């Protein structure tokens, strides 16, 4: 085994798909997200086990391609960190796309079987249900790719999912060793991981650096796309903050009609008294791009009036901000 030494070390090895020895993963009949591009054919039916971000992304992609998808997860709620109304809309659209959701259901068995139309996979649920599907995507999370690092030699120990614990400066328990990205856990996004790497390097070498983690935008590439930044209705309610909501639907906007997205929506949360913008949630085409307009206003402590007083190009989806702002202000009055 090779050894490496340095005054400062940053661990950024990412993650790998979580595997279970009891699951007969073969890369084709039962596969993980890492195997998708190697599939030999498009299945007619697919069961996705795990409704995390990756499981949802692939479930909606396959469903959009015409595959009959069943989604299983032992949790009754999906993506609990996302605004509930946005998730409700996503779930509605998934069902409209002929997807079957088995939430609150745990898998107790999975085995390849022979069928009259070829090989199949039989999945048993603890509730007694059985699902027979052409293929199964096993997506129950990711594990830190730390297995080959010999962390013990450096005085570090990962948790049960291979992740490394860090402080707010991204330092591990060993002060000159830092860790960033997916290997430290949520939110496990490429964008946030890059920012964590920048901050870790600055902290390691005493360079002043500012960042606002509470304003990190999250992009979830389901179909339709989701992006959020700032507070949600649930977090504001839990904190006892008086707030109001403004909404705009893509079907109300010329660009939404042009591109044929009649289901997208943009939602603003703002303080009911000061009108300060508190959060933005978007579902639909271009959500992860549109979110940055709201992110900029949030970063500068702006109010919902910014959108009312600003002219947006026509026809663009950005006009949703103005429509949503008018909707919210009208609710106040």
Where are these predicted regions, by residue range?
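FAD-site-proximal beta/loop scaffold in flavoenzymes
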Residues: 24-43, 130-203
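Short hydrophobic core segments
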Residues: 4-14, 48-49, 69, 131-141, ...
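Rossmann-like NAD(P)H-binding beta-loop-alpha module
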Residues: 29, 40-82, 189
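Glycine/serine-rich phosphate-binding loop and adjoining beta1-alpha1 elements at the start
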Residues: 1-29, 45
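Flexible, glycine-rich terminal cap/loop adjacent to redox cofactors
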Residues: 205, 221-232, 237-333
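A conserved FAD-binding loop/helix module that cradles the flavin
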Residues: 83-89, 93, 174, 180-238, ...
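A Rossmann-like FAD-binding core segment of flavoenzymes
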Residues: 65-168, 231, 238
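A short alpha-helix-loop-beta-strand transition element characteristic
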Residues: 16-18, 157-160, 207-217, 241-246
């Amino acid at each position: 085994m090779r050894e490496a030494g340095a005054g400062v070390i940053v661990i950024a090895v990412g993650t790998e798909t979580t595997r279970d020895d009891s699951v007969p993963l073969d890369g084709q009949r039962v596969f993980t997200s890492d195997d998708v591009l190697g599939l030999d054919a498009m299945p007619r039916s697919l069961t996705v086990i795990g409704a995390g971000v990756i499981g949802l992304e692939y479930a909606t992609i396959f469903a959009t391609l015409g595959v009959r998808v069943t989604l299983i997860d032992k949790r009754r709620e999906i993506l609990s960190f996302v605004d509930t109304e946005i998730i409700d809309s996503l779930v509605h659209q998934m069902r409209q796309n002929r997807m079957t959701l088995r939430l609150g259901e745990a898998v107790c068995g999975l085995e390849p079987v022979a069928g009259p139309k070829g090989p199949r996979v039989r999945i048993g649920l603890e509730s007694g249900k059985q699902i027979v599907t052409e293929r199964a995507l096993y997506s129950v999370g990711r594990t830190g790719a730390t297995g080959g690092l010999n962390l013990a030699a450096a005085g570090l120990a990962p948790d049960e999912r291979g992740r490394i614990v860090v402080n707010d400066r991204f330092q591990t328990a060993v002060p000159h060793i830092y860790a960033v990205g997916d290997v430290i856990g949520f939110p496990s996004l490429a964008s946030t991981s890059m920012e964590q790497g920048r901050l870790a390097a600055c902290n390691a070498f005493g360079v002043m650096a500012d960042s606002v983690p509470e304003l990190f935008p999250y992009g979830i590439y389901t179909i339709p796309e989701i992006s959020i930044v700032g507070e949600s209705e649930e977090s504001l309610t839990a904190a006892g903050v008086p707030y109001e909501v403004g909404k705009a639907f893509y079907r109300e906007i010329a660009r939404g009609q042009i591109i044929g997205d009649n289901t997208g929506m943009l939602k603003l949360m703002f303080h009911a008294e000061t009108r300060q913008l508190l959060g933005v949630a978007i579902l639909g085409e271009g959500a992860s791009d549109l979110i940055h307009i709201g992110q900029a206003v949030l970063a500068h402590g702006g109010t919902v009036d910014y959108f009312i007083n600003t002219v947006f190009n026509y026809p663009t989806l950005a006009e949703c901000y103005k429509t949503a702002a008018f909707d919210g202000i009208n609710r106040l009055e």
